[in-house]
Each structure stands twice: as structure tokens, then as C-alpha cells.
């Protein structure tokens, strides 16, 4: 399935577009998707620790703009937004 990760705030530095696309073979919870994003950033940005911290501290939202928790399961093609903390916290 294709997950389009919409980038907001500081996460926009992850790409020259306003999104990243991930292709995942099976259902995935946000906590595991978060790890996939970090793995991608480790490769793309040679272990940029600040980017990892952004992902770890970020909230995620569903296509219908609801904040979702780490146990939320992505089970189909969908858009997910990553919302980094604002103002340092």
C-alpha cells in the first residue's frame, strides 16, 4: 500500500516536496511507521540526529484531520500528516 506522508513545520526539511511516499507491504501501526520514517532519514540524511528527534516528538494526523496515537493502524492507501512540535515543545 502507498502511504503519503504530508510534511508540516520542521518536517518540511525532509523533502523538497511537501510530502514523502512510502510503500508498505502490510498493515502498520504509527509506532512502526515512525521507525520506518527514521530509517529513511538515516539513509537520506546520513543519521541527522535533529531529524530523528523531530520524528520522535511529532504527532500524526489521519486523512480526516484527527490526531492519531501510536496504536493507530494504517491498513490501506492513505495520507498521514506529521505534525512536529512548535516553539520547542
Label the model's feature ranges.
Residues 1-88:
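Ubiquitin-like/PB1-type beta-grasp interaction modules and other compact soluble beta-rich domains
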Amino acid at each position: 500500500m502507498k502511504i503519503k506522508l504530508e510534511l508540516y513545520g520542521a518536517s518540511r526539511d525532509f523533502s523538497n516536496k511537501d510530502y514523502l511516499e512510502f510503500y508498505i507491504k502490510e498493515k502498520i501501526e504509527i509506532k512502526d511507521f515512525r521507525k520506518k520514517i527514521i530509517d529513511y532519514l538515516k539513509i537520506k540524511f546520513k543519521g541527522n540526529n535533529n531529524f530523528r528527534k523531530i520524528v520522535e516528538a511529532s504527532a500524526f494526523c489521519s486523512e480526516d484531520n484527527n490526531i492519531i496515537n501510536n496504536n493507530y493502524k494504517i491498513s490501506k492507501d492513505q495520507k498521514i500528516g506529521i505534525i512536529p512540535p512548535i516553539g520547542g515543545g
